[in-house]
């Protein structure tokens, strides 16, 4: 994957995986099941509106939830890809590994749906107070 957000990098494409990039999914639901919330925490620096919509649509396709009830958080890592499918050259300086970007983002709907379903299936009762 091209390191699109790492200005001091001496290379454009990763030679291997030092630390994997994750998306952690958390599912919260009220006792009545009326209120639902999904929190997704991505190892990305930024996210385009197209990818944001793709992620929310994939969650809404498997869960009765509004897009406003899906919170997307980003770790702000600079070791990741460009921010979207429309920025394949990283603002002009990426010349290697461009062919890896779209397949990476195209894998999001299935992977995110699987992560959310795993979170839903592993939900346990708890009390939240403050």
Predicted regions and their residues:
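Conserved beta-alpha junction segments in alpha/beta enzyme cores
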Residues: 1-73, 77-130
């Amino acid at each position: 994957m091209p390191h699109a957000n790492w200005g001091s990098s001496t290379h454009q494409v990763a030679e291997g995986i030092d630390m994997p990039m994750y998306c952690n999914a958390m599912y919260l639901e009220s006792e009545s099941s009326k209120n639902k919330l999904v929190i997704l925490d991505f190892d990305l620096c930024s996210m385009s509106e197209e990818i944001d919509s793709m992620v929310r649509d994939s969650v809404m396709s498997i869960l009765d939830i509004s897009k406003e009830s899906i919170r997307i958080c980003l770790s702000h890592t600079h070791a990741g890809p460009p921010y979207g499918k429309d920025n394949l050259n990283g603002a002009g300086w990426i010349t290697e590994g461009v062919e890896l970007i779209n397949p990476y983002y195209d894998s999001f709907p299935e992977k995110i749906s699987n992560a959310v379903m795993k979170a839903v299936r592993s939900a346990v009762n708890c009390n939240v107070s403050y």
